[in-house]
Amino acid sequence: MGISRFSSLLVFIFLTTGCYIDKYTEYKESFFSIYLKEWNSTICPKKIAFEKYVKNSNFKELIESNSDFEIKGCEKTESEFNQRIFTPNTFYIGEINYDIKLIIDDSLEFKITNIQNKLDTVAEKAGPKKWIIMNNINSLIVNGYELDNTKTPLNIWIPTKLGKIIRK
């Protein structure tokens, strides 16, 4: 009696889980947003400069500059998260094979180098046999500090305290 119940249970599990078809979703974006964690200020940034440089050029060979970002995290309802979120209005596509300089309000600078990223397939949390193909940012160096970025592979998370204050 017990063996037939066990066999029935195995057949049921096989039929319900074996019927799913693998579903793949591909994101082509290099990253979705840049998070500056531990902002510790009520000041909301007004301006961002996102500059792409030739990799390992010591920030001397500019490829492109962009200031078209949406800035979030300033509202009182979001203040409990103590962060600012910068999302490009025009997304960057593909693996990141360049260095980045991020300048906030002409006063705070982040030099981002050695970005370790690759195209990878990860399981989607929404259900079985659902997969996401995306660019995973595993680690990066910000102003000389190596950061592990594996917990947020589609975003760039940076502690604000790593920013260099620009003297005028």
Language model region names:
Residues 17-18:
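C-terminal motif of bacterial Sec signal peptides marking the signal peptidase cleavage site
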Residues 26-33:
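Contiguous beta-strand segments within globular domains
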Residues 44-48, 98:
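Short beta-strand/loop motifs in extracellular/secreted proteins, especially
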